[in-house]
Amino acid sequence: MATTGRRLRPPSPNNNRSRTISSSISLPVSLNASLSSSTSSSSSSSPSNSSKRVMITRSQSTTRSSRPIGSSDSKSGENIIPARNSASRSQEINNGRSRESFARYLEQRTRGSPRSNASSRGVKPGASSPSAWALSPGRLSTMKTPLSSSAPTTSMCMTPPESPVSKAKIRSGGGGAVAGVLKYFMAQKKVSPVQEEDYHRFRIFQNRLLQWRFVNARTEATMANLKINVEDQLFWVWLRIYKMRNYVVENLIEIQRLRQDIKVREVLSLQMPLLNEWSKIDAKNSEALSKLTRKLHALSVRLPLVHGATIDMVSIHEEMVIAIEVMDEIEDVIIKFLPRVEIILYELTELIGMFNQELLYFEEMDESLLSIPLFTAKESSLRVHILQKTEEQR
């Protein structure tokens, strides 16, 4: 065939970028031809499938294609039919997706390589999930391109050419298996391009929200650490200020005490010589004080002689002598009565002790009087028992 000699681009590595940006993978031309021949044979055998046209279209991608439309696809022989109206276009897109999935399934079955298995598992026929590369700020301008374009975009072939053995296997496949696989992929849920664009925008917004949440959480953590550090610094500053205040107060108290000591020393420095001489002046001072007391006593006892008053010294002398004799007699009587008074006081103390003992005895007697009725009752009961015993013995 002429198309087998075309140089194909090697497949891209199996990463998130290749899976999320291109929602579907184009088939090689040889596989297209084999698929068209198989479908034509099935359409000739069954009249119900004669109206279906075999074509492999590509789902709309969120990015611009690196290859222009119609440049190399016209040479490869792929049939891209523009849409007449919206209903026929959506039907053709769905048919193309299902057949492309079936072709990918056949390719995986014939090849069995782990890379194709991984790519077929990562790519879904109806939807595409945006990757971190697609959600990057540099790709936002390309993501804003409308998904509902008039014609589907084409991409370069991502699979190597098939061997003649695999082509023969595909051509010799039964029509029943093809119909079952097509029905299985047709029964799956389809996603419209508008919903795909909404999902893509939603993922972008969700990624931005997560980024802002991470930024806010990191700022909150830094602010919390900064707050803790500032609080610690404020606490240590407050502690230092408190210690400085205590130190200043202690210094002020010490200064005030030193000032008072200085004042006391100044006062005592003037009085210390006089205090040292006090031992010599003490006897003279006591004698002068005794003379002063006697003079004051004499002045208080003497009567003033005013208004021509006179005193009979003889009569006063006689009266003073009589008073002194009476005082002496009173003193003698008191001396005589002192032993008697002592005896009387001793007897009074003994009487007080006896009176206290009598009070105790009276209290004991009251208690014994209270117990007399009990004893009498016991005595009567004992007598009754004795009488009963004597009667029983008889």
Curated annotation (Swiss-Prot):
Q: Give the InterPro entries listed for this entry.
A: QWRF (IPR007573)
Give the location of motif QWRF motif in residue numbers.
211-214
From what superkingdom does this record's organism come? Eukaryota
Q: Basic and acidic residues bias: where?
A: 97-110
Q: Name one Pfam family in it.
A: QWRF
The residue ranges crossing the membrane are none
Q: List where Low complexity composition bias occurs.
A: 14-67
Family in the record: Belongs to the QWRF family.
Per its record, how is this protein called by name? QWRF motif-containing protein 7
Q: What is the lineage of its organism?
A: Eukaryota, Viridiplantae, Streptophyta, Embryophyta, Tracheophyta
